[in-house]
Every structure is written in structure tokens, then in C-alpha cells.
């Protein structure tokens, strides 16, 4: 063959090799993302919850905490297309409806007047989705329902990106904490404490609304349908808040430390009073 023919054949072979290598790399890099998407079956089950005053939805973790720490950092389970409806029941006990596939890993623990729902995934799940190497698992739990006795005074939701809705609640005092967002609707509280998360309110009546500005990322009130008496704001940092027109009748600022400050943006005429 001519020298030019050898050169052309070499270029063709090199091209094939480059294409094969790039295809292999693309396949390898796409595998972890595809294998880290956990879609649970839609079949559900229900477990009974004991009478309690405090309810905790504990963080998802493994029996072996070392599996949560890979060379690339701490692993996490992040929910998507997962929501929780929270409602009261006129009974001494409640219930949780969730995917049947999670039943072997879910337990209910009681300590005094506190009820804790714990989801402890086995080591096999972490290895299957390569979480022993670090990273994030996207999990789809679908729609779930949490029914709690009306006497519950505190609800902590510690599943990341769990979208929750609390409705038809009427009580003297309720404290809420979430790692994501909570929509409150058709409820009435004497005292409502928002300690962490994002919150929206629609058709809600609250005489005293307590908001921790250090931990509450945002809150929105549908002024046309809500009735809020006094908003008690507190924090230990520098905060900036906008009070919507008709959001509440009174705002009170309670700094936790001397260095804390609050800048308010008002959308209507107001009277500012400084106590002696």
C-alpha cells in the first residue's frame, strides 16, 4: 500500500477508538445518576400511631452510619414527587399511610408523650444505590397521609424535600418544624409556632403567630382569607421582612441577643410603638 493509504487507515482506526472510548465514558458517567433514582410502588399500607403530644418524623438513615459517609462527603436521601397530608382525628391514637415497600424498614418508637417514626434503610439499599460512596438518592414516595390526635402540640418533619399540607386543624397551640415547605389551610389556632421551614397560609385564623426568623426561610399569608392577630418575630441575627397588606393586626419584635436587628418593609399605613 501507499504511505498515504496507511495514514488514512490509521486515522480511521484512531477515530473508531476515540468514539468507543467516549461512548464508554458516557455510559459510565450516566450509570450512577440512573441507578440513584428510587421509585417506590404505589401500593400502600397503614400503621397505627399511639397517643402523643409530640410527633417526630425522624431523618432517614442506615443502621450502619458509616455507610452514609463516603469519600465524596455525606450521603443523603432527597425526596421528589412525595407529599404528606396532615390532619387531626377525633381519637386517642393516629395513623400513618405510606408505601408498602417501606414497611420492613419503618418503626414507631414511643418515649413518654413523644411518638417517633423512624425509617432505617438496610445496608443493601445504600450499596445498591452506591450511597456508600457518597452522593444523593432521589426517592419518590408518592402521596402519604398522617392522622394525629387533636391533642398533639408539636410536629417535626425531618425528611428532606417532603412537601406537606396541614389542614382542618383547630387547637390552642401547635409548633411546626420542617426541612421543606408546609401549606396550612382551613385551620384555627390560638398560638401557632413556626420554628423551621417554609410556610403558606390560606383560610387560617391565628391569634398569636410566633416565627423564628433564624430558621424560617419564608412565609406567605393569603390576606384575603386569613385572620392573624399578632405576629411575634424573634431571632439572633440581622433580618429583613416584608409585611403584606392586611397580613396581621400587630407585629412584635423580640430580639434574642443584643446584636440582633429587624428591618421591616410595610405595604400599608401603620403605627409603630416602642415600649419603655
What residue ranges belong to the model's regions?
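Short beta-strand segments in beta-sandwich/barrel cores
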Residues: 199
Amino acid at each position: 500500500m501507499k504511505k498515504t493509504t496507511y495514514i488514512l487507515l490509521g486515522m480511521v482506526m484512531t477515530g473508531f477508538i476515540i468514539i468507543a472510548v467516549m461512548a464508554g465514558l458516557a455510559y459510565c458517567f450516566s450509570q450512577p445518576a440512573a441507578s440513584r433514582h428510587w421509585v417506590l410502588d404505589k401500593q400502600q399500607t397503614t400503621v397505627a400511631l399511639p397517643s402523643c403530644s409530640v410527633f417526630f418524623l425522624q431523618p432517614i438513615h442506615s443502621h450502619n452510619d458509616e455507610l452514609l459517609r463516603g469519600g465524596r462527603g455525606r450521603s443523603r436521601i432527597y425526596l421528589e414527587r412525595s407529599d404528606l397530608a396532615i390532619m387531626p382525628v377525633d381519637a386517642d391514637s393516629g395513623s400513618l399511610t405510606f408505601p408498602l415497600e417501606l414497611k420492613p424498614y419503618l418503626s414507631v418508637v414511643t418515649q413518654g408523650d413523644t411518638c417517633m417514626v423512624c425509617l432505617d434503610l438496610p445496608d443493601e439499599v445504600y450499596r445498591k444505590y452506591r450511597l456508600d460512596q457518597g452522593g444523593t438518592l432521589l426517592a419518590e414516595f408518592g402521596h402519604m397521609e398522617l392522622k394525629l390526635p387533636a391533642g398533639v402540640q408539636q410536629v417535626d418533619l425531618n425528611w428532606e424535600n417532603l412537601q406537606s399540607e396541614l389542614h382542618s386543624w383547630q387547637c390552642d397551640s401547635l409548633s411546626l418544624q420542617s426541612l421543606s415547605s408546609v401549606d396550612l389551610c382551613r385551620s384555627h389556632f390560638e398560638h401557632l409556632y413556626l420554628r423551621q421551614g417554609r410556610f403558606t397560609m390560606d383560610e387560617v385564623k391565628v391569634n398569636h403567630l410566633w416565627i423564628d426568623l433564624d430558621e424560617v426561610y419564608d412565609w406567605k399569608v393569603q390576606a384575603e382569607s386569613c385572620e392573624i392577630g399578632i405576629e411575634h418575630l424573634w431571632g439572633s441575627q440581622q433580618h429583613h421582612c416584608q409585611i403584606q397588606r392586611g397580613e396581621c393586626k400587630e407585629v412584635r419584635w423580640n430580639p434574642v441577643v443584643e446584636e440582633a436587628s429587624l428591618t421591616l418593609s410595610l405595604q400599608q399605613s401603620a403605627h409603630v410603638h416602642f415600649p419603655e
